[in-house]
Swiss-Prot record:
<dbReference type="Pfam" id="PF02132">
    <property type="entry name" value="RecR_ZnF"/>
</dbReference>
<keyword id="KW-0863">Zinc-finger</keyword>
<dbReference type="GO" id="GO:0003677">
    <property type="term" value="F:DNA binding"/>
</dbReference>
<dbReference type="Pfam" id="PF21175">
    <property type="entry name" value="RecR_C"/>
</dbReference>
<dbReference type="InterPro" id="IPR034137">
    <property type="entry name" value="TOPRIM_RecR"/>
</dbReference>
<dbReference type="InterPro" id="IPR015967">
    <property type="entry name" value="Rcmb_RecR_Znf"/>
</dbReference>
<dbReference type="Pfam" id="PF13662">
    <property type="entry name" value="Toprim_4"/>
</dbReference>
<feature type="zinc finger region" description="C4-type">
    <location>
        <begin position="57"/>
        <end position="72"/>
    </location>
</feature>
<keyword id="KW-0227">DNA damage</keyword>
<dbReference type="InterPro" id="IPR000093">
    <property type="entry name" value="DNA_Rcmb_RecR"/>
</dbReference>
<feature type="domain" description="Toprim">
    <location>
        <begin position="81"/>
        <end position="176"/>
    </location>
</feature>
<protein>
    <recommendedName>
        <fullName>Recombination protein RecR</fullName>
    </recommendedName>
</protein>
<keyword id="KW-0233">DNA recombination</keyword>
<dbReference type="InterPro" id="IPR023627">
    <property type="entry name" value="Rcmb_RecR"/>
</dbReference>
<dbReference type="GO" id="GO:0006281">
    <property type="term" value="P:DNA repair"/>
</dbReference>
<keyword id="KW-0234">DNA repair</keyword>
<comment type="similarity">
    <text>Belongs to the RecR family.</text>
</comment>
């Protein structure tokens, strides 16, 4: 029990962050109050501004302060003919960092999960359907997570693409660079064998 209701309230609200339990939240609160009050004020200001001004791109649904994000506004990207479907906005920077993709994106904000009441409409597949109908795509790359839900979501979207005669592909899953076979789980190794490629000399 804290001596200050305000401190208790701060600790409780810090727990909304992923991976932050009671002890971590308490350490954060004490650190801000004891050593970095100016940092705490800056954090509060940044949070308030971000929560009030950041919305979703009307095309790809990623986070942006404008109606359309920088990637969707890029003419080179618009004419690429490639669309990459991801589960979360945080997946976009990860793919961009590789430098291997120069097309556009569509963010699902989750994956299909009927048991949790998450169907096609809840992850924006009606909006994706409209994009497939009205925009010209050569290929749709499915970059959902390698989970049961992610695979089910990818299969559902693949069927949508087939209806529009659009080429569809799935990102490869397999052994990480620098990894050793004996430490790799069976499912990952299985995907690696299925997704093997021929060596060209």
């Amino acid at each position: 029990m804290q001596s200050s209701p305000l401190l208790e309230n701060l600790i409780e609200h810090l727990r909304c962050l992923p991976g932050v339990g009671p002890k971590s939240a308490q350490r954060m609160a004490y650190h801000l109050l004891q050593r970095d009050r100016s940092g705490g004020m800056n954090l509060a200001g940044a949070l308030t501004e971000a929560m009030s001004k950041i919305g979703h791109c009307t095309h790809c649904r990623t986070f942006t302060e404008e109606e359309s994000c920088a990637i969707c506004n890029n003419p080179r990207r618009q004419n690429s003919g490639f669309l990459c479907v991801v589960e979360q906005p945080s997946d976009i920077p990860a793919i961009e960092q590789t430098g291997q993709f120069s097309g556009r994106y569509f963010v699902l904000m989750g994956h299909l999960s009927p048991l949790d009441g998450i169907g096609p409409k809840e992850i924006g597949l009606d909006l994706l359907q409209k994009r497939l109908q009205h925009e010209s795509f050569y290929e749709v790359i499915l970059a959902t997570n390698p989970t049961v839900e992610g695979e089910a979501t990818a299969n559902y979207i693949a069927e949508m693409c087939f209806q529009h005669n659009i080429k569809v592909s799935r990102i490869a899953h397999g052994i990480p660079v620098g990894g050793e076979l004996e430490t790799v789980d069976g499912t990952t190794l299985s995907h690696s064998l299925i997704g093997r490629r021929e060596i060209q000399l």
